[in-house]
Amino acid sequence: MKKTIKRRIGKILYHVIGKRLPLSGARVSFGARKFRQFCAHLMLEDCGKWVNIDRNVTFAYDLKLGHGAGIGANCQIPSGVTIGRQGMIGIDVLMFTNEHRHDDITVPMGLQGRTEIEPIVIGDDVWIGSRSLIMKGVHIGNGAIIAAGSVVTKDVPAYEIWGGNPAHFLKSRLPGAEQTASAPKEGERRG
């Protein structure tokens, strides 16, 4: 009962005030970062310290947010997402953990319901560039970087840099590893 009341108070404060406060890095931010952090701790069951949820972020209340994680302005994060410690999510990033059903051609897609949630897991110290799309069921390994504007449709190993549509391997962050992706052969597709 106490958790439910706490969560409701957090939701009201966040949606009425927190979402509308200036960006966290603005010259005059009116304590926006600390206020949204306070709201996140009220709403989320698993929320680390020193998190930053920026302006106009929409997120599900089962979001798991690690210590020091940051979510940029205008992101949309659905149910079933975990963001590890020190994860950096750029502005306008969209995540999808399910989709519309489309199996029955005799029924409009909008009336067929949605598929089951396939969780997205983003590891520790991951940087996801602005305006990227992260699709259902994707796991992004620790230390990975996703280039801005990428569409991530499959798992990304730890300490690799991926980009493109669909996202593909660009380079490793590990010393001594192959540092660039080889050019695709004639007729071969990446991703």
Language model features by range: what are they?
Residues 30-37, 58-66, 70-138, 165-166, ...:
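Flexible, glycine/small-residue-enriched loop-and-beta-strand segment within the central core
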Residues 82, 100, 150-151, 157:
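Flexible glycine-rich beta->alpha loop in the catalytic core of nucleotide-sugar glycosyltransferases
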Residues 162:
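Conserved active-site beta-strand element of glycosyltransferases/polysaccharide synthases
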